[in-house]
Amino acid sequence: MTDLKLAAQRALNLMDLTTLNDDDTDQKVIDLCRKAKSPAGLTAAVCIYPRFIPIARKTLREIGAADVRIATVTNFPHGNDDIEIAVAETRAAVAYGADEVDVVFPYRAFMAGNEQVGFDLVKACKEACGSQALLKVIIETGELKEEALIRRASEISIDAGADFIKTSTGKVPVNATPEAARIMMEVIKAKNPKVGFKPAGGVKDAAVAGQYLAMAEEILGKDWVSARTFRFGASSLLASLLATLGHGDKPANTSGY
């Protein structure tokens, strides 16, 4: 297997296959779940809005893909600073049966100088997840922009109990970048290597995925990269990976994520 194919296979098994669109329907989520059971193996998870968790769970069981985890989003996509709402949404997501919750850090309040609300929101949402769900914190690096802000938001999220830190919602102009990824993984190495990392948005093909995997191995070691500590948030990436692996043609890109 070539290096590119190896990267494609690894990336596929580390993917949170995502649909987070305003026009999502039960049928679109059913189709997404079927894609998660790909000709080259299972994706790590699907990532969907909370109301679709029951239909996703049912579909994954029916197709023999119950090992695919179900991730959802809260405080999404704007990262508001209302802790009560974020916690209520997170509790509801866990009650629906989410295995993982991707919560948006209150990045605008943080950029305005309020570090405490970020810590408190992440801590409260982690408590709401209990032992039932992993908490991934989206810090929205494309809006933070500055290295110092990306570093500090990563530190606060980890200190507050995040299981993963994630670059982006996919809903702003700039999503995952190698520069932001390096900063975030350096913080993970310094603070707690048990915390995972998820680049989201802008990872379009096996070559780009391979660059992120190589960076993760360089910073945190070859044994660190697994579905427990590394995910790709993506939608259009799957078709490209399957094409690289010899399964069908690469269709047109239909999503910015």
UniProtKB/Swiss-Prot annotation:
Pathway membership: Carbohydrate degradation; 2-deoxy-D-ribose 1-phosphate degradation; D-glyceraldehyde 3-phosphate and acetaldehyde from 2-deoxy-alpha-D-ribose 1-phosphate: step 2/2
Catalytic activity: 2-deoxy-D-ribose 5-phosphate = D-glyceraldehyde 3-phosphate + acetaldehyde
Entry keyword Transcription regulation: no
One cellular-component annotation, GO: cytoplasm
EC top class named in words: lyase
An example Gene Ontology biological process: 2-deoxyribose 1-phosphate catabolic process
GO molecular function annotations of the record: deoxyribose-phosphate aldolase activity
Compartments reported by the entry: Cytoplasm
Coiled coil: none
Function text: Catalyzes a reversible aldol reaction between acetaldehyde and D-glyceraldehyde 3-phosphate to generate 2-deoxy-D-ribose 5-phosphate.
Protein family membership: Belongs to the DeoC/FbaB aldolase family. DeoC type 2 subfamily.
Name recorded for this polypeptide: Deoxyribose-phosphate aldolase
Organism this protein belongs to: Aeromonas hydrophila subsp. hydrophila (strain ATCC 7966 / DSM 30187 / BCRC 13018 / CCUG 14551 / JCM 1027 / KCTC 2358 / NCIMB 9240 / NCTC 8049)
Gene name of the record: deoC
